[in-house]
A protein has these predicted regions:
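Transmembrane alpha-helices and adjacent helix-loop boundaries
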Residues: 1-253
Length: 253
């Protein structure tokens, strides 16, 4: 078998579909990394609270242990199961509970029906990616907090700062700066993982390629094309990560 006879001209009529798919991929990534950052910070702080001074109240100590257990279970589930399964679970199991014409927890009636028809796939995909990203970002934050020398925490306590003040003014600012390259790498992962959302009918890049492949029974051209788009997006993000890893004086600041 020789090299494939590529016919790039078949993509011309589908250019708007690929543009819309690329924009949808970027939107999914932005929503997931933003929501995942908020969720990951909360989970990371809960997981790291084991190093906090022991509360005087037994009830508060018990509540803290329970929250840490829940956080560990959450992170373990979303890091230990396939993202594809998580997307299907959110779309076909969780989504009908939250938004349903009959008795949705968040939305019901005609508004729920219209929302699911127009935005259901995006909501499910963004939610699944956000929940998954939150688990990974929480571990990034926990590692960032642990990378701060314990002497800084002890010094902050010695001048009268509470644990919360120490985290806010001393630990978190440094940890968040160290997290930036890892967060960009997580964004790169989300860009590539967003292709899985095509399984629930969201019109992103993978679905655009599948549409062209189905119309012409040709696979090289559409899938090579979206591979190039994914590569451009991830190279831009990877370049950003490398730039952020450089010392500030080398970045020109």
């Amino acid at each position: 078998m020789g090299l494939p006879d590529l016919r790039w001209g078949i993509l011309v009529g589908y250019w708007p579909l690929f543009v819309a798919g690329a924009w949808m991929t970027i939107q999914l990534t932005l929503v997931a990394i933003s929501g995942g950052l908020l969720l990951g910070v909360l989970l990371g702080l809960v997981s790291s609270s084991v190093d906090a001074p022991r509360p005087a109240s037994a009830w508060a100590a018990g509540a803290g242990r329970l929250l840490r257990l829940v956080a560990r279970a959450y992170v373990g589930f979303f890091r230990g199961t396939p993202l594809f399964v998580q997307i299907l679970l959110v779309h076909f199991a969780l989504m009908p509970m939250l938004i349903h014409p009959d008795a949705g927890w968040l939305m019901a009636g005609d508004a729920a029906r219209e929302f699911r028809q127009n935005h259901g796939a995006f909501f499910s995909g963004a939610l699944a990616l956000t929940l998954n990203a939150g688990a990974y970002i929480s571990e990034i934050l926990r590692a960032g907090i642990q990378s701060i020398h314990a002497g800084q925490t002890q010094a902050a306590h010695s001048i009268g700062l509470t644990h919360a003040q120490t985290m806010r003014y001393v630990v978190l600012p440094q940890a968040l700066r160290r997290m930036v390259p890892a967060l960009v790498n997580e964004a790169v992962t989300l860009v590539k993982d967003s292709s899985l959302v095509s399984a629930i009918g969201l019109g992103e890049l993978a679905l655009a390629a599948r549409t062209v492949a189905g119309a012409y029974s040709r696979y090289w051209e559409p899938y090579l094309f979206i591979s190039a788009i994914y590569l451009v997006i991830t190279l831009v993000l990877s370049t950003l990560a490398k730039r952020l890893e450089m010392p500030s004086h080398l970045r020109g600041h």
